[in-house]
Amino acid sequence: MTKKITKIIILVILSAVIIFEVGYIINRNILNDNTSNSTIEITPEPIPVVGRDDENDDAKEKSKIIVIDPGHGKPSSLMSDEEKQSSGWVQNSDGDWGEWRHYKSGSATENCEGSGCNGRVPTNGACWYPIANGDRSKESDINIRNAMAAKRHLEAMGYTVRMTRNSNNENPSITKRLSYCYPNNDMTKSPDARLFISIHSNASGGESRGVAYISAKDPYDQAWITADYSKLSNELGSLCTKQIDEISSLSIYGNGEITWEPELITFCKSPVPCGYLEIGFFDNSSDFAILNSENEIIGEGVAKGVDEFCKTH
């Protein structure tokens, strides 16, 4: 009986060992088959491209160079011929001093000399602009004081300012003034200025008062300007006018826009948007007092208008 039980136990143990071995072999074969038929895919990390510039032109930092033009200057009667020539004035076929209102269409360097331009001129005006037409007495000094104040405020805001004149002993032509929109006044190069601000004061018989801007109106056809040149020029002029009205004692003249002088040489030749400001009426006693006492405030208004424009365009 004992022997029989012992045999049974041995058989059970042997059976268990056989079952274990068979199971191990089957599992090993299955594992080997799965391993040999499978692949492991590794997705590599993207390699960064060093130095690639994905920014488009509009996203790049725009110029912070502002050209400020204090209108008028030294009376032409006090200028020698050499001085006129060095200041950008030219002589026409009659030997008279002045400058041409336009460039040849599409140019930024070739004066029209009466043809090859869009021909836009003021009422009773012409392509030729005599030097004496720009002579002023009181206004020149008012303009440069307001312009210098604007320069100080703009520089404090981080802008680079180029002045078209720095004293009342200078009277560059408009063409020469606009050359400051270019690096080193080199008009064969691309303009590097952002904006051109022309600062003037008005006169109208002593009754009118206030600040306004002269608006541009298409068509203009000089080189470098964009399709929205007039629109941008008018937005710039409007912003400066509103800021001066807001912080100074000057009020707005009319609705703040003077619409009847879009043929100004500045508009016809500037390569960049141009704000053309008429700040107060110097022949009105109340405005004249403000113009003599609030230059710093007026300059701040101009600077704030420029800064607002640059931050929104």
Feature names for model-found ranges:
Residues 2-313:
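Catalytic-site microenvironment of enzymes
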